[in-house]
């Protein structure tokens, strides 16, 4: 199993323990500097696993082709799209390459309503489901399912400081903090794609 860009390790501390019965956990990051930070984070959480890299500029990865059953990413695709260029497309292609045929790509990210102006994806931290589907399908994936487990109908996705206005970040500081706390964390898409056999 690969987790792309594990950040502070909230999911990693759980995921790194799952493949104990003969499987493996690999954290996938975009630089050697990030790799060292992830190694330290995993150790601090009592978790273990390999750390690999992917270059968003090229899609080249240290994870072998056709070697993984699952790739997961939590709230990271918006960062790839906001980076511009081919970063998102290249990383999606790398995920496709590292997965075995029949393997699963799981994505959770902040959801922009389908009716919203697509230009808002550039800076808000929100993405349309259609944008994520297009990236995945262009890399060769097929949509296999979705879930509303991370849905939040209170989130209107139209805040002055984007998704970071909401908890836990509260980018607006104390301004309207109670209002944003009542909304809660972002509305999120939860998508499952497969690499065809």
Where are these regions (language model features)?
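Conserved SAM-binding loop of SAM-dependent methyltransferases across substrates and taxa
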Residues: 8-21
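A short glycine-rich, Lys/Arg-flanked "PGG" loop and its adjoining helix->strand segment in the class I
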Residues: 17-19, 86-101
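S-adenosyl-L-methionine
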Residues: 37-60
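A short acidic, Gly/Pro-enriched loop at the edge of an enzyme's catalytic core
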Residues: 61-72
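Conserved beta-strand signature within the Rossmann-like core of class I S-adenosyl-L-methionine
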Residues: 102-110
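Conserved Class I S-adenosyl-L-methionine
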Residues: 118-146
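C-terminal lobe and adjacent flexible extensions of AdoMet/dcAdoMet transferase-like proteins
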Residues: 176-197
């Amino acid at each position: 199993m690969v987790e792309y860009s594990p950040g502070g390790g909230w999911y990693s501390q759980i995921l790194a323990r799952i493949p104990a019965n003969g499987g493996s956990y690999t954290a996938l990051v975009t630089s050697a500097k990030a790799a060292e930070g992830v190694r330290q984070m995993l150790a601090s959480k009592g978790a273990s696993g390999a750390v690999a890299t992917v270059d968003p500029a090229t899609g080249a990865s240290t994870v072998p082709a056709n070697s993984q059953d699952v790739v997961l990413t939590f709230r990271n695709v918006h960062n790839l799209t906001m980076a511009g260029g081919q970063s998102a497309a290249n990383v999606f292609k790398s995920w496709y390459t590292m997965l075995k045929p029949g393997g699963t790509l799981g994505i959770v990210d902040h959801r922009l309503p389908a009716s919203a102006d697509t230009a808002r994806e550039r800076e808000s931290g929100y993405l349309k489901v259609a944008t994520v589907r297009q990236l995945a399908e262009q890399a060769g994936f097929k949509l296999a399912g979705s879930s509303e487990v991370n849905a939040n109908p209170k989130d209107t996705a139209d805040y002055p400081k984007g998704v970071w206005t909401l908890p836990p970040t509260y980018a607006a500081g104390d301004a309207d903090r109670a209002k944003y706390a009542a909304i809660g964390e972002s509305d999120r898409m939860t998508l499952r794609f497969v690499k065809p056999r």
